[in-house]
Amino acid sequence: MAAKTPAQWKTLFENVPFHRENYYTGPLGPDYAPGGTCLRLWAPTAEAVTVTLYHKGDGGAVLGTKPLVRGAHGVWSIWLPGEQHGRYYTFAVTVNGITRETGDPYARAAGVNGVRSMIVDLARTAPSGWERDVRPTIPPAQRAVWEVSVRDFSQDAASGVRPAWRGKYMAFTQQGTTLHGDGIHPTCLNYLKRLGVKYVQLMPIFDFGSVDEAKPLLRQYNWGYDPTNFNVPEGSYSTDPTRGEVRIRECREMIAALHAAGIGVVMDVVYNHTYRTENPLNNTVPYYFFRQNADGSFSNGSGCGNEFASERPMARRYLIDSILYWAKEYHIDGFRFDLMGLYDAESINAVRAALDSLPGGRDILLYGEPWQGGASQLHRYEANKANLAMLNERVGIFCDDTRDAIKGGCFDAREPGYVEGKPGSFWDIGAAVAAWCRSDRLPPHAPSQIVSYVSAHDNFTLWDKLLCVRYEKPEFTARDTVALAQNRLAAGIYLTSFGLPFMQAGEEFARTKKGVGNSYRSSPALNRLDWNRAEQYHALVDYYRGLLALRAAFPRLGSTDRRAPEALQFFALEQPLVGWMLPAVWGDGAAWSALCVFYNPTDTTRTVSLPAGQWKLLSDGTSSSLWRGQSRVFTNKAPLAPYSATVFGAV
């Protein structure tokens, strides 16, 4: 039989009978038991499949090669008798007369650089007390996400983390770290507990291909948005990437330590593409898992060379299986989808439904980027902003409308936003406060669908953006009082808005990457969190800390009710001031019966009239913790400092 062309494979895989004949619902991957292990591989187009066994994850002698037997629905399998924990393996899959050696797409462990898969008894990788680890219960009003790379978190020698754990999973487990070990200024986990964020979003932690795990990491760096093995933790973050079980145990220890601190873990997942097309998915069933152009070439909506075909039944099943695996075996508390606009909405809703079926699964967060990285061949309803109405109300999106309204556009370094004085932007600030629930632009099902933010790993840090707007040639490491005030104002807006607050790690201490807007493979020194800045800008850190606590003390801001923003009462003020009042919900435990909030993006003090009653000053342009003490009470008019968010509580 003549070999199929890529275009012919595309035609076959878009054929309903193919899916009817080959869709499979049974177990896949390694099924370990002490008496033996069954390997199962879905490869319906394969002519032959063999497995080669190894004692080591890299190099070493071959222990043997055995054929797999084809069964129903294109599933190949083999039973390996005896104890197989720690045994490494690869498949050789023959399709179209071409044989490709590959790892197992369903592998749960792997050797160095993820080339060889490993059979693992997950029970042996459980850290002490893992069976008692539970997801922390975090009320909506307390939810705020802090995004960080495992590497960036502790790479700085000033972090106080022991050298062997810097840039590793284990850094999250070290208690009581302080700046240079001074015993005074907290860093890492110690710092997070004090700051008050309740979720840490980890940039990709599943096995990625851009860092050579076999080489020293001193000069290697990558964010990790180039996955290789979707169900295996990244090895460069472990203390020993050559032993497949170590990365699993240490990743779990990291998660358990965060949970013990009352912090949930959000996993940044990148199923939308792979590092190379020569990966376990494509080597097993060539062309099936990736979208194709009309000529059979790979579509490139990710901007990285390929894009995952989530709409195909077994691809969707793989996506759901992988998400559930991380949720169940790693106790993950949330998932952030990179380029979620490259998935069809039906698949994302199916992921949400699958998570909801787990015990406590309805509390697992799910949100993503509602855009693509290029032209896509996805011709179904994309999970993007335009189709927000088609997504489950507990699927959230990053709101670039909020981001750009507050600080200015991302693609022009000098374009200002509201906090830098952009004319007319106050209209969008009002919409952002209401999480766009009162706008026709992108009305969500619920305010909690909107992820409100001003900085993430992509594009400029907030500090760098503020300086780029202010100066043609900014000095990023110089202290700037106006930029600091604008930073506080930006935080004051999104942390007093409806929606899910999100921040890039270090935003709260004026993190700078010295004007580098895309540092995905820049030096470790540029990307690391500079813990000295947390001390140098401690007043800014305290401002974020106070706002997070203030928000938690007024639960209505975290409401998941679509109608909640309708209670906002906006004031008619002189432009560009924005002001609003929001009554509390009776019985929700709010510290005040109402909030009254004003934003002043100008360089002069303004005076505003307050609603009738007595209003305690809770937060102003420099301190967000006034509410903790005996602060001033206003009854008529009140001043607004330049570049400030000012918050009052009804007493």
Model-inferred region functions:
Residues L41, F91, V148, L202, ...:
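Conserved, mostly hydrophobic/aromatic
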Residues M1-P34, V62-L63, R70-Q174:
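The feature marks proteins involved in alpha-glucan
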Residues L41, E47-D58, V62, T605-T622:
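Beta-strand-rich binding/interaction modules
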Residues V120, R352-A353, L358, R362-A505, ...:
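Conserved alpha/beta catalytic core and glycan-binding cleft of carbohydrate-active enzymes
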Residues R151-Y330, L339-P359, L365, Q377:
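Substrate-binding/active-site clefts of carbohydrate-active enzymes
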Residues D31-E47, Q569-P611:
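Carbohydrate-binding surface patches
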Residues E21-G26, T496-V516, R528-L595:
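Glycan-recognition and catalytic regions of carbohydrate-active enzymes
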Residues A43, H85-Y89, Q630-V651:
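C-terminal beta-strand-rich structural cap/linker in extracellular carbohydrate-active enzymes
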